[in-house]
Amino acid sequence: MKYLDVRLPEFANEFQQVLSRGKMDMKEVSSLVQELLDEIRTEGLDALKKHIARFDKWEVKSFEDLRISPKECLNAYNQLSSELKSALHLAYDRIYAFHRKQKMQSWIDCEENGNILGSKFTPMERAGLYIPGGKAAYPSSLLMNAIPAIVAGVKEIVVCSPTPHNQANPLVLAALHLCGITEVYKVGGASAIGLMAYGCKEIPKVDVITGPGNIFVACAKKLVFGEVNIDMVAGPSEIAIIADSQANPLYIAYDLLSQAEHDEMASSILISDSAPLIESVQKHIEQILPSMPRAEIAGASIKNRAVMIYTRNLQESIEIANAIAPEHLEVLTTTPFDTLPYIKHAGAIFLGEHSSEPIGDYLAGPNHTLPTGGSARFFSPLGVEHFMKKSSIIAFSATALEEVGESCALLAQSESLSAHAQAVLTRLDSIKSKRE
């Protein structure tokens, strides 16, 4: 892991590497991804068969082979222990309750002159959710992507998830049953994104695609944007922790490792004005890491992507965190809420020593699909709004048009758009003639 000290002259250059973490160079994969997307667009099911044989190592003989039936999902759910069922239901209920508060309501404003203005919020008709299935398959990702769509009122929700060697993850199947999703396809990678974006003879296209994935999935989402809407282009997972001298180093070590075990490319960053704390955290990581089930993955992440940043004071720690704009930001200080007004850029903010980032991953309620790689400066967490669209409502009365019509025509004429102006002036003439 790297150790950076803001006091040293080389800090600025070294910190630039932290700011460029998670940046995905898609040049090397974009041509392959575009080729796969083009094949899906033109060949449909035949292309899917080729791609699945190539990447997931099993043979698709018919369209039905691609589908996961509701019965399979029910069977997987029934085979769960009662404790795991309860945990899934608890997560579902908490995530649903949080996202229900996000749902936007249509509104109309009626002015005295009869002018009516408003916004109408409508759910997307068909949403596509991508659920990873590589080194680990996450039922939590299914819940986090499906529940906002359910709350939004999306009528048709389709899920695509890879099944290497035609083996589906039973926990994901159980979560599908819990969410009531019945249209599920055993397709992964760029092929899945293409299938949902373009559709084929057997499967209609979707309106929006959400969900995390590897660089091929991210590249495919970027390429199909405009054909459909997407949530964001996300990269490897990351965490930054602001901590003072009173923070618990063992808590910090586990929270950093919780990101490192996701992926070799995950970033774990500690920002503190306490050198003894940083040293203690490093020692705890060294002690814990060898016994972790995913020690190889976590070890590679810690070795190559973990950073300890030693600052002068808490204010500087906050400034560093804002520059990083992390996916997850923990604040482990004596008075964490005092820092909240000064935090500008983070996907999710965890305040206090009991607000461990994994709580947010599973069942706190807020979504765990978050912007990465510094994109929290302009992207937001996945939410109900990603599955809804807004239409403006405009209804002018004759009186309202008379009040502003000439100004509107003048603006149109200033832009040399004569038909725009005449469309308004003709109506004004008609209103005047009726009154005469």
Curated annotation (Swiss-Prot):
InterPro entries (alphabetical): Ald_DH/histidinol_DH, Histidinol_DH_CS, Histidinol_DH_monofunct, Hstdl_DH
Keywords from the UniProt entry: Amino-acid biosynthesis, Histidine biosynthesis, Metal-binding, NAD, Oxidoreductase, Zinc
Pfam family, one: Histidinol_dh
Function: Catalyzes the sequential NAD-dependent oxidations of L-histidinol to L-histidinaldehyde and then to L-histidine.
Active site, per annotation: 327-328
Residues given in the record as substrate binding sites: 237, 259, 262, 328, 361, 415, 420
Domain of life of the native organism: Bacteria
SUPFAM superfamilies reported in the protein's UniProt record: ALDH-like
Cofactor: binding comment: Binds 1 zinc ion per subunit.
Cytoplasm recorded as keyword: no
Cofactor: Zn(2+)
Enzyme Commission numbers on file: 1.1.1.23
Molecular function in Gene Ontology: histidinol dehydrogenase activity; NAD binding; zinc ion binding
Protein name: Histidinol dehydrogenase
Pathway(s) annotated for this protein in UniProt: Amino-acid biosynthesis; L-histidine biosynthesis; L-histidine from 5-phospho-alpha-D-ribose 1-diphosphate: step 9/9
Originating organism: Helicobacter hepaticus (strain ATCC 51449 / 3B1)
GO BP: L-histidine biosynthetic process
Binding site for Zn(2+): 259, 262, 361, 420
Disulphide-bridged cysteine pairs: none
Keyword Ribosomal protein found: no
The family this protein is said to belong to: Belongs to the histidinol dehydrogenase family.
